[in-house]
């Protein structure tokens, strides 16, 4: 068994707990027993002293009768001795006769009773003044009780106690190991289930029944982790498949065109036209690769933003000029309102707004209007892009930031690689981090609408600043957190 095993630790804790309880109980029992015996001895000595005093009163002035009656009283107790001293220190009476006054140099007094050990024996004594019926001064009486049997009893009790403690420790260690082993069986089952899981079985979950309450939180968290891993693994698999598909198309086009041209000799104009077509495909392929590299860098925090003061109205006007001809061809009007200044990375802002505008143009019907409004709230700037469009199906809401994700699972050709809304989280990696995305549930929703992915949808993207705004502009900086999606 490993020293660091949980079973061993629980067993040791069980042993320590049992040993501590037994020691506390043993020490308490020992002290209470000693106090009880001490009280019994003091009571016995007190009763004998009262009897001696009563005999002294009843014997009158006859010393011999007094001594005889004291002898009768004390002689029946072999473990009890008595010495009566006159005021000058000479003995008046002793029983047994050879009894001497005890030396109190090493004696201690507890509860009015003297206690000491001598030559391996233990004694307790009580002293008092005894008055005689005659006019003579009172005597000093010493009653000494031999309690060696008590000392032997407690010595035996201690031996038994330590023996029982040792046996109980060994037994509790064995029982503690069995109890811990049995109690940790659910953990072993969880471990076996976790060990049996692989990339192909991430959909399995550890059942919560029958599981102790202490492990429910752990298993719930573990199952949640499996869910996240399964989702991430599926997204990664789909991402890899989509990358292969997106890269295969331009490469296949290049190879096909080249094979056709090389099949026979052709005029220089044909070669020039083919090279131009190949260059177009290469540019598309380069754009896809650049986009993937950009997103990979953003995921790893390798993009360092260059914050400059930007006039949002100027940014919107510039992008409107870029998309003006496309909007005219589709019969869509572009409308901008409001103005505000912010500190942000111009490339990031252009990239995000351009992506949103292109998606809005793609899914806005002819004759409709795309509205971009800028609202300066003093401490934050709100950028809204509104366009009419169909409602997002709820099951797609959690996937709006997935790269290459499309509502229609069927693949389609086009110039877009599907990276779309994944540009919005890029702002998080670029330190412009508080971009809230609102998703309207229906056409009557009062939230503004915004297209943010390469599929028919409605979204609202609003960059908010948590920092302090300077006069005339709002700063988006390091203290801002999160790119959130909420319905």
Curated annotation (Swiss-Prot):
Q: Which reaction does it catalyse?
A: ATP + protein L-histidine = ADP + protein N-phospho-L-histidine
- Residues in the Periplasmic compartment per record: 1-9, 158-159
Where can this protein be found? Cell inner membrane
Q: Listed GO molecular functions?
A: ATP binding; phosphorelay sensor kinase activity
| Enzyme Commission numbers on file | 2.7.13.3
Major enzyme class: transferase
Q: What does this protein do?
A: Member of the two-component regulatory system CopS/CopR. Involved in the activation of copper resistance gene operon copABCD. Specifically recognizes or transduces a signal only in response to copper. This would lead to phosphorylation of CopR in the cytoplasm. CopS/CopR may also regulate chromosomally encoded genes. May also be involved in basic copper metabolism.
Q: How does it sit in the membrane?
A: Multi-pass membrane protein
Which loops or segments lie on the Cytoplasmic side of the membrane, by the record?
A: 31-136, 181-487
Sites of the modification Phosphohistidine? 245
Arranged from A to Z, the UniProt key words for this protein are: ATP-binding, Cell inner membrane, Cell membrane, Copper, Kinase, Membrane, Nucleotide-binding, Phosphoprotein, Plasmid, Transferase, Transmembrane, Transmembrane helix, Two-component regulatory system
| Annotated TM spans | 10-30, 137-157, 160-180
- The chain positions of domain HAMP read 181-234
InterPro entries given for it?
CusS-like_sensor, CztS_silS_copS, HAMP_dom, HATPase_C_sf, His_kinase_dom, HisK_dim/P_dom, HisK_dim/P_sf, TCS_sensor_his_kinase
Protein name, as recorded: Sensor protein CopS
Output the PROSITE patterns linked to this UniProt entry.
Answer: HAMP (PS50885), HIS_KIN (PS50109)
Q: What is the lineage of its organism?
A: Bacteria, Pseudomonadati, Pseudomonadota, Gammaproteobacteria, Pseudomonadales
| Gene Ontology CC terms, in alphabetical order | plasma membrane
